[in-house]
């Protein structure tokens, strides 16, 4: 099919050089030369978070995968570095949250273009000739086999082998999947076009070479693809020793490129034949013909040998031994990096940056000129003939230098909430990071780290950014007023739980239903048990009878004082009396109305409450019940700051364990934050915490590598390299996220507006917040606060929500 002489004397268009003919099965392309190809999209392990031992283990498993293939196969391993998605758009209901997000958008775009890397493995197989298959059938007689066309057998064999390869990749990589028809055509189109777009497979997917080409290729010493100049760098020399991810520094570059490593494996006999030829040639070069003649004439052994030839022969012999033992396979490897740009000088600068990285790792390379078009064609998936480099390479060296790993950028969308990521962050490289709280339908998260490392700032930012989701509500249990400013800026309500606060509860308001009665009884029994009253069946009956009588009263009379008047037992009356208006706690628990606001953002200050061990359990038990009634399927974030307060009490620990197991069904994400990892590891519910919170964010901790703390980090599944990253991170700037999808060290990159709202936890800030709140009221708090912090431009913008595209303007 490659012979075009019937139509034209020589190839005249880009389509003539392409091999892709048609789609014959899902994701499988039949090429013009009869070969089959299939592409796997994968995401390799994160080298930044891997220990040397883990890297060696991954290399060994990749070597096992690569050594499965023999003659007739071609492997194209590609890292496609592309521009990252733009900053996500959202519809905001809160001016302060909108302004913070616009500030973050401006900072994100100011840092220049961001890039991320997609990795692909294209497997190409050339079936044996039909006459070979016919000869095989002469020696194999299987009456159970129905006669079938050779091409169906070849297709079935190809599908089986590629599926096995995909399964092996899925075992050692976070993600590995076959491309479907549309994704395959989109990928092939991106290789030969300057325009990135989605390509839909036609109903009759034939003539793919003509279908996919929309950009002309101009040859010459400096070829052009459309209006963009192509620059190709080919590796032609290798260092003496390798290591896993030896070229991973290419993943840090701030421009787009295609890095393609093509491997043409050889069968064992063919590889042995080639290596034997190498060894014989080098062995013969150890001594010249003159030295042989001198040795014969003088009968004395030659003393001068070509040491380099001797070493090369020994190297070839060692390669033969590795091949014979089945440790490795050999093949021909071609590695090329392709960059393109409309400005030829920019393309030249980019290829020089690539060359500096490659030469810095001990490789030699050449910037293609005469061979540029041939080298570019050799990078196209399925092309096994163009630009073949002759030196043999074993599969371990291939695993070291191929693009088998990439920085994890995070998912582009929160699929569970059907929206954008929670927040965009940056890292040391040009690859951005997208934080998504959900793993499947589980949005629980743990935030762990020492005091003063930026925990409260992160929690406040999470609350602000979570408001990007439609119908989102945020409930915060705070300590020290850290989230007070963010809550008020969102138009929420901040409560100080305690006797001096402005919040009062009416626990028996909902006695009109059976559920309300049962809940009230459980609350009262917990109260009397705390007062050292033994809960017997008689006590339960007495409480139930009193509650039934109280339920018949008007709603405003369903108070704790009313319950005490209806209880017949003097012991129960004495136990309940401290919580009525006649006792010290009545102002908080014996109200005739419930003053808890119905807003979407509520914050409860726990500092004063938790100092009273007698008051905290009944107050929090009732408050938890009130909040659970609001968990109605809307996206909800429940933030528990300083969570050791909850772990310290059996009732709270049990409630937290139940929440982690059940609230995901109500679309609630529990964010559990604490300063001490030991509090969690020593808690009775530690297994539930670790299992139910798949996403964990660790704060910078310079003492993380100390033996006592290292053991605690290891209990959370961190390895030595990850602990080292946490120890080297900068407090209040760097955060390390760990989740099943990947790991990443990221920087929130907060601007002055975000810092004004999120970093306002000092006593001076609390005093200023109270003064501004008293002067401007809740509705005017956000602009007044920004004015007080000297951000006059931001205060002016906060009233123009939706009218300007970017806060920086």
Map each language-model feature to its residues.
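The conserved Walker
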Residues: 439, 451
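Conserved P-loop NTPase
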Residues: 716-772
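A short helix-turn-beta junction within AAA+ P-loop NTPase domains corresponding to the substrate/partner-engaging
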Residues: 492-495, 685-699
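Walker A/P-loop NTP-binding active-site region of P-loop NTPases
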Residues: 453-506
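Conserved P-loop NTPase catalytic core
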Residues: 511-514, 691-715
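Extended, folded cores of ATP/NTP-driven motor/assembly subunits in large transport
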Residues: 1-409
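P-loop NTPase motor domains
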Residues: 45, 52-68, 273, 277, ...
